């Protein structure tokens, strides 16, 4: 399985002053923990890190021995552009790809393998968890408009997996039509292409704030 890891997070909400994947988690960087999980999956055989050139040496150095097992890909101005760059950099024989947020450093390798396996039967899959909170849709003034049935609500995670040719086609259409999305599954939604949900775990958090880092430390100490 070919694997792409967008790794250009600025860390502004973390107030880190650097790429957030360089932040320390129990003695190792976030990118180290992410690569440890990804490379532990039985299905992983090729990994590309997509980041900004200025961060290349810092990220690869902090990845330690794992750096020798990955390929560096220069990212774009947005996550969407970076993923497209990653797709263009895949080996020509790549048929399937998993895309995973670099800041989700606690992904279970078994879930990676499950996503890879599900791509044998589906053209697109994503990890997600059932929403447990009541969600409100509000208007521009901040007043509640409606409350959707949470039985149909899932919180999207990564990895998200796709057939390479299909995802490339979706990204090229997005460029032509100037679509802006925050994850790759959204492109499939716009095109009315099916995406299969695979239930993930609540421990697969994305490190975006200081409280997330505190939670991640608890999971690392108590796996």
UniProtKB/Swiss-Prot annotation:
NCBIfam families: ispD. GO terms for biological process: isopentenyl diphosphate biosynthetic process, methylerythritol 4-phosphate pathway. One of its GO terms (molecular function) is 2-C-methyl-D-erythritol 4-phosphate cytidylyltransferase activity. InterPro entries: IspD, IspD/TarI, IspD/TarI_cytidylyltransf_bact, ISPD_synthase_CS, Nucleotide-diphossugar_trans. This is 2-C-methyl-D-erythritol 4-phosphate cytidylyltransferase. The lineage of its organism: Bacteria, Bacillati, Cyanobacteriota, Cyanophyceae, Synechococcales. The record marks 150, 206 as: Positions MEP for the nucleophilic attack. Its EC number is 2.7.7.60. Coiled coil: none annotated. It comes from the Bacteria. The record marks 13, 20 as: Transition state stabilizer. It catalyses: 2-C-methyl-D-erythritol 4-phosphate + CTP + H(+) = 4-CDP-2-C-methyl-D-erythritol + diphosphate. Catalyzes the formation of 4-diphosphocytidyl-2-C-methyl-D-erythritol from CTP and 2-C-methyl-D-erythritol 4-phosphate (MEP). Pfam families: IspD. Pathway: Isoprenoid biosynthesis; isopentenyl diphosphate biosynthesis via DXP pathway; isopentenyl diphosphate from 1-deoxy-D-xylulose 5-phosphate: step 2/6. Transmembrane segments: none annotated. Belongs to the IspD/TarI cytidylyltransferase family. IspD subfamily. Keywords: Isoprene biosynthesis, Nucleotidyltransferase, Transferase.
């Amino acid at each position: 399985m070919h694997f792409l890891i967008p790794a250009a997070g600025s860390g502004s909400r973390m107030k880190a002053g650097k790429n957030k994947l360089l932040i320390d988690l129990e003695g190792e960087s976030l990118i180290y923990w992410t690569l440890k999980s990804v490379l532990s999956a039985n299905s992983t055989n090729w990994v590309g890190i997509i980041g900004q050139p200025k961060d290349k040496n810092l990220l690869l150095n902090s990845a330690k021995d794992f750096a020798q097992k990955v390929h560096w890909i220069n990212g774009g101005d947005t996550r969407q552009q970076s993923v497209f760059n990653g797709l263009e950099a895949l080996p020509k024989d790549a048929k399937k790809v998993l895309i995973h947020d670099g800041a989700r450093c606690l992904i279970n390798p078994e879930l990676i393998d499950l996503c890879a396996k599900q791509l044998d039967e589906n053209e697109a899959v994503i990890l997600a968890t059932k929403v447990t909170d009541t969600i409100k849709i509000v208007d521009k003034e901040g007043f509640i408009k409606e409350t959707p049935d949470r039985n149909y609500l899932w919180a999207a995670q990564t990895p998200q997996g796709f057939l390479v040719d299909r995802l490339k086609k979706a990204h090229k259409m997005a460029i032509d039509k100037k679509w802006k999305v925050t994850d790759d599954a959204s492109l499939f939604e716009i095109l009315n292409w099916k995406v299969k949900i695979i239930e993930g775990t609540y421990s697969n958090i994305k490190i975006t704030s200081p409280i997330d880092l505190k939670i991640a430390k608890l999971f690392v100490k108590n796996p």
